[in-house]
């Protein structure tokens, strides 16, 4: 069965469109005087095949400059030095400590006793059933014996008392941080700035800021099928482990005790302050220039965390944001920065993905297309759209709709922003081009029903009913559609 919710959560993280409203965003940088005047764009029409309704409404569309360089960028590994700068930007002078599963001698002795019983037939059959096949019993026993042997070896090298170890700014394979994986012998291979191809390594640390516990987690994944360089910093909420309702209640209490909880939405001044704080953080962390938008989000019903501020960033190059970075057909996540804050401005979570570095900037000999050039080209392309050329992953979506017997009644694309900036496209050698582009980001909705199952109109792309992010992007050098 298709997992729509997981897919859409991933898309929300990977397919960022950072065309933001002025009242909730950091001030856009000045890009020069040699630009056209801003445009009002208003149009409603149906595609030539009569299947898709498109509406475009933006009273202040971005102006098109006369020139923008084409940039070649490549993924930037997060080294130990870069990770240290990020941590200092986030936490100031607060000391970070190694994140580990280290146990004291006494605690290991307890684990040895636990696993000496866990390897017995009585324990295994109690966990897996009296009628469990003997082959299964033996496989479970082998796994538990390996853990028992691990603790027996660890006992001789363990400390009598476990005290925090200051962060050593070393990257380890992920197993280093696993339960039953602490390196008591100190023999695990580590890295600081060069990571072998095909390997994923982590640097994890913990700290406190204003009495709130945080984890700081950096990953460099150099595997062939999918690369990743990312940072996560987040509050360490205790694992309450009860029912969902009880967890929400305990989470609410914990957030209140930490001063992170609010039962009302942030007002405009708080949203603006959050964007300003995001700009400060990105500068202090050495992340380059970003443009931010913010929104109040209510997480009370889902997690018990209350109202928070969610800030979304778009990277800025040469004074222009990267408006669209499709993940389709690529082995590297879009460059993104998302932050969650309490209404007070206290950090709750920060996710930074796919840092890039510019390796070449190519000035264009010819001027960019003007709005007079682009408007008819864009409208003509939109009118010729079909399900196949508009709906992301249409073949697989159609296959699923056919399986469940869905009947489409309406496909609608609502565009409320027209943006000038860069669109990221794959290039050779694992790098990317940032292409000057005119973007029409919007919400794509596919409405339909399932005869005999769900007769009332339903959203076929998004079961939560929030639409589906898409962007129609046009190359300002030649007017062609990108992607």
Language-model-detected regions and their locations in the chain:
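Intrinsic disorder/low-complexity detector
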Residues: 6, 36, 325, 404, ...
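C-terminal motif of bacterial Sec signal peptides marking the signal peptidase cleavage site
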Residues: 15-18
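Positively charged n-region of N-terminal signal peptides that target proteins for export
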Residues: 1-9
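Segments that shape or occlude catalytic/ligand-binding pockets
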Residues: 255, 260-262, 274-442, 454
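Preferential activation on post-signal-peptide N-terminal prodomains/segments
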Residues: 20-328, 356
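A short, surface-exposed beta-strand/turn
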Residues: 212-249, 320-355, 446-483
């Amino acid at each position: 069965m298709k997992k729509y919710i997981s897919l859409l959560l991933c898309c929300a993280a990977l397919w960022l469109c950072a065309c933001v409203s002025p009242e909730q965003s950091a001030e856009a940088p000045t890009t020069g005087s040699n630009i056209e005047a801003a445009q009002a764009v208003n149009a409603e029409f149906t595609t030539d095949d009569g299947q898709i309704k498109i509406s475009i409404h933006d009273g202040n569309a971005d102006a098109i400059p006369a020139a923008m360089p084409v940039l070649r960028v490549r993924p930037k590994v997060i080294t130990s030095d870069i990770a240290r700068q990020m941590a200092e930007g986030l936490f100031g002078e607060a000391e970070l400590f190694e994140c580990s599963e280290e146990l004291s001698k006494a605690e290991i002795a307890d684990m040895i006793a636990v696993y000496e019983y866990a390897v017995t037939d009585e324990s295994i059959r109690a966990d897996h059933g009296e009628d469990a096949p003997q082959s299964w019993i033996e496989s479970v026993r082998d796994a538990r014996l390996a853990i028992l042997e691990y603790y027996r070896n660890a006992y001789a090298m363990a400390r009598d008392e476990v005290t925090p170890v200051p962060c050593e700014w070393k990257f380890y394979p992920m197993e280093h941080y696993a339960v039953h994986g602490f390196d008591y012998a100190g023999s695990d291979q580590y890295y600081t700035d060069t990571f072998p191809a095909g390997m994923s390594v982590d640097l994890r640390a913990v700290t406190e800021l204003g009495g709130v516990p945080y984890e700081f987690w950096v990953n460099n994944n150099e595997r062939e099928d999918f690369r990743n360089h990312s940072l996560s910093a987040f509050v360490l909420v205790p694992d309450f482990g009860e029912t969902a309702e009880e967890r929400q209640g305990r989470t609410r209490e914990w957030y209140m005790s930490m001063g992170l909880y609010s039962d009302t939405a942030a007002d405009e001044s708080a949203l603006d302050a959050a964007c300003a704080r995001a700009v400060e953080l990105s500068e202090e962390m050495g992340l380059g220039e970003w443009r931010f938008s913010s929104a109040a989000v209510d997480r009370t019903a889902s997690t018990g965390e209350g109202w928070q501020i969610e800030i979304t960033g778009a990277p800025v190059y040469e004074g222009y944001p990267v408006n669209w970075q499709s993940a389709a057909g690529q082995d590297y996540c879009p460059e993104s920065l998302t932050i969650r804050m309490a209404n007070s401005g206290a950090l709750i979570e920060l996710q930074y993905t796919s840092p890039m570095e510019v390796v070449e900037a190519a000035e264009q000999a010819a001027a960019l297309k003007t709005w007079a050039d682009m408007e008819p080209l864009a409208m003509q392309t939109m009118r010729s759209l079909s399900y196949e050329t508009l709906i992301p992953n249409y073949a697989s979506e159609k296959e699923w709709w056919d399986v469940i017997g869905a009947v489409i009644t309406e496909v609608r694309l609502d565009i409320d922003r027209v943006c000038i900036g860069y669109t990221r496209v794959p290039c050779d050698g694992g790098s990317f081009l940032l292409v000057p582009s005119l973007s029409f980001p919007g919400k794509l909705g596919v409405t339909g029903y399932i005869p005999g199952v769900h007769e009332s109109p339903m959203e076929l792309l998004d079961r939560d009913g929030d639409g589906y992010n898409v962007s129609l992007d046009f190359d300002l050098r030649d007017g062609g559609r990108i992607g």
